[in-house]
């Protein structure tokens, strides 16, 4: 394994980007405005069984119905990304696709800052998705949008089996997405990369909760809010057997981010940019402190907004501008 770089005498200050206007997606995000349900139903007829009229008289789906959300995601992936076959086992996270796409578009902009403003595209760009999950959503969107080569890593064999089935069912993904198991559940980056392997960026949506009980309470609260507190509403059965690693880890998000910061320094020579979503605002400052201690050369904080949800993307690198320029010359030319 390459040796960690020497710590800079004075860590560079974080470059903070103002969050976008509330509800505003990235300009390249395909999911602007209202959903075109007739077009979605055309590519995925089963969606028609789940379309309802919302209180504003517009077509929608019941986002508190897991079956409806899964079929809706399937239609979005088919309509916008050409993914014709997508399914996940019951009990796994069904991600909001517009928000996942926003993360990837912001990462593309990040790489462009080291490439004279041009987004580097194609299979020569390698991305490592930490916690790819059963849905494989980041590699699917990232490969379809930018042609990047993805490594999807997870600790759960069942999640990887689901992701492999998705990739195998869509021939256009062949060679563009590979999946690896992290054999040590206590590690994040360590043990995943070969000694001579280089990765241009990493991404992660870390587990938020600190325990299974906390995750259960949080999910129950979410379902009740979606159901508008209707006492007659039957809540879905919450099964966390398959998705425990997606929802919680000891110490919650903060502990995971601390470990990620520490491990990133140990593989710093192999990665250009590391990144992670951060759900809890107070954890951003904590992460900045851990990264300064680890010797990060630069940290960037990007605000993102989808509907009512505000989130943060934190990216960091152990390479200064000169080293990033050398990386570009050796890998992107």
UniProtKB/Swiss-Prot annotation:
It comes from Ectopseudomonas mendocina (strain ymp) (Pseudomonas mendocina). Its EC number is 2.1.1.181. GO terms for biological process: rRNA base methylation. It catalyses: adenosine(1618) in 23S rRNA + S-adenosyl-L-methionine = N(6)-methyladenosine(1618) in 23S rRNA + S-adenosyl-L-homocysteine + H(+). The gene is rlmF. Residues 1-10 have a biased composition (Basic residues). It is found in: Cytoplasm. This is Ribosomal RNA large subunit methyltransferase F. GO terms for molecular function: 23S rRNA (adenine(1618)-N(6))-methyltransferase activity. Its main location: cytoplasm. Keywords: Cytoplasm, Methyltransferase, rRNA processing, S-adenosyl-L-methionine, Transferase. Residues 1-31 are annotated as: Disordered. PANTHER family: RNA N6-ADENOSINE-METHYLTRANSFERASE METTL16, SAM-DEPENDENT METHYLTRANSFERASE. Belongs to the methyltransferase superfamily. METTL16/RlmF family. GO terms for cellular component: cytoplasm. Residues 12-22 have a biased composition (Low complexity). Specifically methylates the adenine in position 1618 of 23S rRNA.
């Amino acid at each position: 394994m390459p040796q960690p770089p020497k710590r800079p005498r004075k860590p560079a200050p974080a470059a903070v980007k103002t969050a976008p206007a509330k509800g505003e997606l990235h300009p390249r995000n395909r999911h602007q405005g209202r959903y075109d349900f007739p077009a979605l139903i055309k590519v995925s007829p089963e969606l028609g069984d789940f379309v309802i009229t919302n209180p504003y008289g517009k077509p929608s789906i019941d986002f508190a119905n897991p079956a409806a959300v899964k079929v809706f995601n399937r239609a979005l992936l088919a309509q916008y990304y050409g993914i014709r076959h997508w399914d996940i086992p019951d009990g796994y996270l069904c991600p909001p696709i517009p928000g996942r796409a926003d993360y990837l578009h912001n990462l593309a902009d990040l790489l462009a800052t080291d490439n004279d403003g041009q987004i580097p595209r194609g299979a020569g760009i390698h991305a490592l998705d930490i916690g790819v999950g059963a849905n494989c959503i980041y590699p699917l969107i990232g490969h379809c949008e930018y042609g990047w080569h993805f490594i999807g890593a997870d600790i759960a064999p069942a999640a990887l089996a689901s992701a492999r089935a998705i990739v195998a069912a869509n021939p256009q993904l062949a060679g563009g997405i590979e999946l690896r198991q992290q054999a040590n559940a206590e590690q994040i980056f360590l043990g995943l990369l070969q000694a001579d392997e280089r990765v241009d960026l990493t991404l992660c949506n870390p587990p938020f909760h600190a325990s299974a009980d906390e995750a259960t309470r949080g999910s129950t609260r979410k379902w009740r809010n979606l159901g508008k507190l209707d006492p007659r509403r039957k809540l879905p059965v919450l099964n966390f057997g398959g998705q425990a690693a997606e929802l919680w880890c000891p110490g919650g998000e903060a502990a995971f981010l601390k470990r990620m910061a520490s491990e990133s320094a140990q593989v710093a020579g192999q990665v250009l940019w590391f990144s992670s979503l951060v759900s809890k605002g107070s954890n951003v400052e904590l992460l900045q402190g851990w990264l300064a201690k680890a010797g990060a050369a630069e940290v960037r904080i990007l605000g993102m907004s989808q509907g009512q949800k505000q989130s943060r993307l934190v990216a960091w690198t152990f390479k200064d501008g000169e080293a990033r320029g050398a990386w570009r010359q050796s890998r992107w030319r």
